[in-house]
């Protein structure tokens, strides 16, 4: 069986319908190939529990990994208000999903458990995809564990409803906030990783001196709107109007 990777997107009134559409769109592209792994990118508008339930109902007991996001992406650009389901088919490789629901509360212990799970894999792990809670928890300890590993690791912090302070990770039949989900890949599989960003150095650098939850309230001891007004050349009293109000 030749390897094949596809992705389908779906939209609906709820997560179940959107996920059902996404799976069907992906399966149509696979043709006669059978999926061996599912990766799910859930729009923040939907219940991730509903999405996991719908995907599992259609695909059975496949390894499932994913996270919530403000907007899934495709080659055609952003796909807002949607669910994306990527399917990988083929043989000769291994995929295992590990799930830790207590990442936000016990970051140090989870980082240790993650490193141990990689070392204890019977089949050598060649690469790992990670998704961690994007609001709660400290990912720095996890990054320290990754630095000590001689393998490809990629991933990031889940996005979603930052106003409510809730982002979600998906792993197996689990879907919760405050969690860490790891997809371990091995066997006859070639992996390549690349990274880039569109930011340009502006020369501005400020230290966050005060914050509440996800809201920055102080930069170098100054209210952020005053900092941005000075940097962008706007009067401080225009903080309630664009573009200052957008920061």
Regions found by a protein language model. Name each.
Residues 1-58, 62, 67-71, 75-247:
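Small-residue-enriched flexible segments
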């Amino acid at each position: 069986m030749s390897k094949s990777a596809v992705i389908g997107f779906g939209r609906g009134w709820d997560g179940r319908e959107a996920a059902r559409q996404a799976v069907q769109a992906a399966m149509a592209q696979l043709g006669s190939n059978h999926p061996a792994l599912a990766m799910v990118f859930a729009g923040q508008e939907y219940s991730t529990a509903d999405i996991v339930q719908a995907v599992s109902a259609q695909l059975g007991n496949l390894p499932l990994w994913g996270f919530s996001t403000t907007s899934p992406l495709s080659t055609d650009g952003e796909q807002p208000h949607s669910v994306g389901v990527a399917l990988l088919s083929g043989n000769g490789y291994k995929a295992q999903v590990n799930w830790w629901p207590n990442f936000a509360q016990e970051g140090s212990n989870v980082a240790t458990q993650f490193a141990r799970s990689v070392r204890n894999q019977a089949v050598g792990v060649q690469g790992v995809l990670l998704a961690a809670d994007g609001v709660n928890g400290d990912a720095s300890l996890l990054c320290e564990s990754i630095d000590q590993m001689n393998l490809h690791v990629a991933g990031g912090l889940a996005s979603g409803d930052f106003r409510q302070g809730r982002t979600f990770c998906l792993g197996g039949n689990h879907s919760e906030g405050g969690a860490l989900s790891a997809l371990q890949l091995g066997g006859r599989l070639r992996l390549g990783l690349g990274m880039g960003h569109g930011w340009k150095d502006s020369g501005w650098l400020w230290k966050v001196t005060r914050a509440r939850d996800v809201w920055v309230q102080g930069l170098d001891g100054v209210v952020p709107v005053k900092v941005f007004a000075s940097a962008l050349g706007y009067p401080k009293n225009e903080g309630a109007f664009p573009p200052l109000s957008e920061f």
